[in-house]
UniProtKB/Swiss-Prot annotation:
Function: The beta subunit is responsible for the synthesis of L-tryptophan from indole and L-serine.
Any one Gene Ontology cellular component term annotated for this protein: cytoplasm
Keyword Amino-acid biosynthesis carried by entry: yes
Family, per entry: Belongs to the TrpB family.
HAMAP family on file: Trp_synth_beta
NCBIfam families to which the protein is assigned, alphabetical: trpB
Alphabetized UniProt keyword annotations: Amino-acid biosynthesis, Aromatic amino acid biosynthesis, Lyase, Pyridoxal phosphate, Tryptophan biosynthesis
This protein's name: Tryptophan synthase beta chain
The protein's required cofactors: pyridoxal 5'-phosphate
Enzyme class: lyase
Binding partners and assembly: Tetramer of two alpha and two beta chains.
EC number, as in UniProt: 4.2.1.20
Modified residue annotations for N6-(pyridoxal phosphate)lysine: K87
Classification lineage: Bacteria, Pseudomonadati, Pseudomonadota, Gammaproteobacteria, Enterobacterales
Organism in which the protein naturally occurs: Salmonella arizonae (strain ATCC BAA-731 / CDC346-86 / RSK2980)
Amino acid sequence: MTTLLNPYFGEFGGMYVPQILMPALRQLEEAFVSAQKDPEFQAQFADLLKNYAGRPTALTKCQNITAGTRTTLYLKREDLLHGGAHKTNQVLGQALLAKRMGKSEIIAETGAGQHGVASALASALLGLKCRIYMGAKDVERQSPNVFRMRLMGAQVIPVHSGSATLKDACNEALRDWSGSYETAHYMLGTAAGPHPYPTIVREFQRMIGEETKSQILDKEGRLPDAVIACVGGGSNAIGMFADFINDASVGLIGVEPGGHGIETGEHGAPLKHGRVGIYFGMKAPMMQTADGQIEESYSISAGLDFPSVGPQHAHLNSIGRADYVSITDDEALEAFKTLCRHEGIIPALESSHALAHALKMMREHPEKEQLLVVNLSGRGDKDIFTVHDILKARGEI
């Protein structure tokens, strides 16, 4: 099929979907391209971001956790966004696209529940019916978000197949869309999946990096040495990275979930420890068994528990423009506690992975003068029960 935009990032990406979905993807691409050129659409999107979601979000300088080092550390506060995470940005854009295409329903998948909450709030705001697929395990560990979705009128459908996590929810959502695309828009929650989703999601998240660049220049008079973001599918990270890709002096660091440790096999780090394959409509690195089956990923944070990664991240990794590292559950938990106790901010466990790597950079080189920005992609309200149970089991509370 001929596309209006390049469906690949280097060798990664593409449109590996059943033929029945090609017209829906083509319609979506056409709507997106025309919307990007439409001042009325852009004004409506900008208005929602400002007056409904609460943009721009703050860039907060850490006051205490850098003590004894020469690091200056800022947090891009996506946790302050309405809905509690960066997810709200792009769902408002996609919901407006759905209306533009004349759709009346939204289908979504969710892991941590943040994309589900964002999809539910955008659907409620714009008068769209919403059904959300969620792995049964995630329904259990993210009960506050499940209730939030239902409060806003969304139907939450637990998925019991496979590992009962995000990858299975993605499969069910795509299956639903195959039979309902004439009336429904599939609101994919990350910068992955078949073209044009990785491009759409990046463009509807790129204000994160644009604001960060403007704010850091205003506060420090220079660009950061590195911007750091957690990577599951990779939408918050690509939103942060996009405006810095052409700034060679700025390091781009993506942090994958190391789970119980890479050596245990229980992790979610396909970029550095997976193999390229076809999954979820795209060609990208993914966690696979020896015979090519998709392997179960694992992370303490439901939102990073995904066995593949967005194709643009795979490309940035392959050309050496971005560095990808991993952080274990324990390291993320320590960073979570550090930010709570020393800065009075409760971060999402996903974001805690990015913070943990920044703290590692700071502690390994305390004498090094460096300016770092961490994308604090979401707040940790949804994780307090998970953290409580772990700390209680350890006798820390």
